[in-house]
Amino acid sequence: TERTSETWFVEGPSHPYYPMCREAGRGANKESCIKVMRAMQGWSSLDRLSELDLPTLIIVGDKDRSTKPSDSIMLWENIPGSVFCVLPDCAHGAHLEKPDLFNKIVGDFLIEHMKDR
């Protein structure tokens, strides 16, 4: 889990939230991680994404190594009316690396989409 959580931050282990994430990840053991990965193999919801009819915000860090950028783009292209946002100089932990920017983007999205509710 240490190697994985290192990739969640552009700064790697020197990021202030790295120790917290590393500790949280220690609860997972190798066997359970393998079972999760096997369960996900071959599973896809791509054919059902077009059924989503709720406002959807997709946020990805431009330096995310945990999820492929193409996965986020695929979500954006297949969820009708979705909004796609790339946070600069962020990895998988974009919400921890740039919390002010992340919160502004989420807040603006919620305000915009709550107008009609």
Give, region by region, the residue ranges found by the protein language model.
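Short beta-strand/loop motif that positions the catalytic acidic residue
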Residues: 52, 58-60, 64
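Conserved alpha/beta-hydrolase "acid-adjacent" motif
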Residues: 65-71
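Active-site acidic short loop of glycosyltransferases
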Residues: 53-54, 80-81
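Catalytic active-site module of serine/aspartate enzymes centered on a nucleophile-bearing elbow/loop
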Residues: 81-117
